[in-house]
Amino acid sequence: MVFQLICSTCGRDISEERYYLLIKELSLKKVLEGVKNNCCRLKLSTQIEPQRNLTVQPLIDIN
């Protein structure tokens, strides 16, 4: 699942580009070829969340 990403400057939905970056693992350069607005390009380049590590660590008993 990819969370929705909206460009705060122009209002364009750039979730599909985020999907290609995170799920399809395309390079940022390849994805940005299809994005024309500079504001959207900047948002994609700087605000993509890295994959989260969802493994649970056991609690350490300090007593």
Curated annotation (Swiss-Prot):
Q: Which UniProt keywords are given for this protein, alphabetically ordered?
A: DNA-directed RNA polymerase, Early protein, Nucleotidyltransferase, Transcription, Transferase, Virion
Reaction(s) catalysed by this chain, per the record, are:
RNA(n) + a ribonucleoside 5'-triphosphate = RNA(n+1) + diphosphate
Induction: what does the entry report? Answer: Expressed in the early phase of the viral replicative cycle.
What GO biological process terms does the UniProt entry carry, in alphabetical order? DNA-templated transcription
A Pfam family for this UniProt protein? Answer: Chordopox_RPO7
Q: Which GO terms describe its molecular function?
A: DNA binding; DNA-directed RNA polymerase activity
Q: Give the EC number(s) listed in the UniProt record.
A: 2.7.7.6
The record's function comment reads: Part of the DNA-dependent RNA polymerase which catalyzes the transcription of viral DNA into RNA using the four ribonucleoside triphosphates as substrates. Responsible for the transcription of early, intermediate and late genes. DNA-dependent RNA polymerase associates with the early transcription factor (ETF) thereby allowing the early genes transcription. Late transcription, and probably also intermediate transcription, require newly synthesized RNA polymerase.
Q: Assembly state and interactors?
A: The DNA-dependent RNA polymerase used for intermediate and late genes expression consists of eight subunits 147 kDa, 133 kDa, 35 kDa, 30 kDa, 22 kDa, 19 kDa, 18 kDa and 7 kDa totalling more than 500 kDa in mass. The same holoenzyme, with the addition of the transcription-specificity factor RAP94, is used for early gene expression.
Indicate the family of this protein.
Belongs to the poxviridae DNA-directed RNA polymerase 7 kDa subunit family.
User: What is the protein's given name?
Assistant: DNA-directed RNA polymerase 7 kDa subunit
